[in-house]
Amino acid sequence: MAAATARAVVSGALFPVIAVCLLLLYLIFPQIPDQPQSGPLFYSVKGPGSQHAPFIASLGLAFIIGIFAQRSRFCTMGAFRDLFLFRYTHLFLGLAAMFAAAFIANALTGGLKFGFEGQPVAHSDFLWNYLGMVTAGLAFALAGGCPGRQLFMAGEGDSDAGIFALGMLVGAAMAHNLGTASSGTGIGVYGMQATILGFAVCLIIGFVHSKKA
């Protein structure tokens, strides 16, 4: 990652403005029960996309979690970077706390399952699970932070993080429409090819932009 540089205010405000506009669209065209569309917006009526907390709870928790994450610089990638390179444990302790909280919550609600079998919305092909996460991890390392950190920085006005966050939205839409997304029924039709291509692209970007010490 290159050093941060000052840019125009409009550049930094672009992603927060887009996020506010999307929120306003939701308020103007709220989801109609059991209907896949409300005005120009489309909603999931089944599957994981349809499972979410009530709007007020989601917004309130997002506000609280966002404050803590921004102030603590929470980042899963940064946690391991600081631990291995600088022996700095501040971010890693935050990651460990999140893992412990998720573990306890799942144990109390009966959602704790070990292994690949029986996991919600996931297939059991170990190799492509592993390669998919290697590709994702490499992309996050090149970007300088995990997806959550990118969202937090985008909200702070980091235009690079804003582009990354928009890329995640566009990428998710393309994956589901082009047959590369996987599910509990198995690997997507073109999931393997997309994983290999994505990994190759990340390697090329990394080597092309690498600098000698």
Give each language-model segment a name.
Residues 1-213:
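Membrane-interfacial helix-loop segments of redox and metal-homeostasis proteins
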